[in-house]
Amino acid sequence: MATLKDQLIHNLLKEEQTPQNKITVVGVGAVGMACAISILMKDLADELALVDVIEDKLKGEMMDLQHGSLFLRTPKIVSGKDYNVTANSKLVIITAGARQQEGESRLNLVQRNVNIFKFIIPNVVKYSPNCKLLIVSNPVDILTYVAWKISGFPKNRVIGSGCNLDSARFRYLMGERLGVHPLSCHGWVLGEHGDSSVPVWSGMNVAGVSLKTLHPDLGTDKDKEQWKEVHKQVVESAYEVIKLKGYTSWAIGLSVADLAESIMKNLRRVHPVSTMIKGLYGIKDDVFLSVPCILGQNGISDLVKVTLTSEEEARLKKSADTLWGIQKELQF
């Protein structure tokens, strides 16, 4: 007896269903799900896989997204505790880890998250040996280093979300002051994601007009307009949002989808993301810090050599020394 499906549909070929543009998100907390929905809304994948250790939450999140399939263009959404669901991913985004508590520094989280990565990374590598790894868990610069060490991947394929969000926050606040959309406000925050990030005042511009040239005191203590406050707000904003709502999610999710778009579509846009910076700015250790990187289908293909003042360079070097001080103590 022919089934309804057989009566309705005449099959022409037996297809091998291998995804061409698969993305995996590891960790379905607030950040992971914000990344997932942002990626779905941008139509970046033909398959989305979710992985977590909390099975009920994982299944619930998957079902909730699947129920929105009519409004999306991602034909397959899967999940599982077992990493076989991640097989053949082009991009694997790691958001799993212990959550930053109110008032806790990102660096405090580190050994807790290293132990989690020792389980996650080998499993990802086993099923998607050619993927790009995008690390979002904090402290992101150290955990990107950890992922690079554990995975054995070349450095172009291990990317930290780094200062992409810090720079976005900076451009938003700059835009608020000037009454201009953030897309037209150019400014870069580099170095360590978080407390010791470095704003590059000399590069701030609107329509190619340098703000520092118009206002030489920009970013200094003697600045009457106190533009330094803008960077201070960038640093404090995550802590403030955590204090108010318990965690941050939407902005980091959108920021990660922005990076995913450059990778999946081979756009070769420039983003401030965390990469291995040894040999630059007098840094001699294996540390990952954010500098402007060209992102495409192979991950980070190139980086832009930013002209920094001696003070900015010194701050970058200090960040590197701090990170290395922590990294060399880590137990793998």
Curated annotation (Swiss-Prot):
The active site is at H193 (proton acceptor). Belongs to the LDH/MDH superfamily. LDH family. The modification N6-acetyllysine is found at K5, K14, K57, K81, K118, K126, K224, K232, K243, K318. Homotetramer. Interacts with PTEN upstream reading frame protein MP31. CDD domains: LDH_1. One of its GO terms (cellular component) is mitochondrion. It comes from the Eukaryota. This is L-lactate dehydrogenase A chain. NCBIfam families: L-LDH-NAD, PRK00066.1. There is a cross-link at K57 (Glycyl lysine isopeptide (Lys-Gly) (interchain with G-Cter in SUMO2)). The modification Phosphothreonine is found at T18, T309, T322.
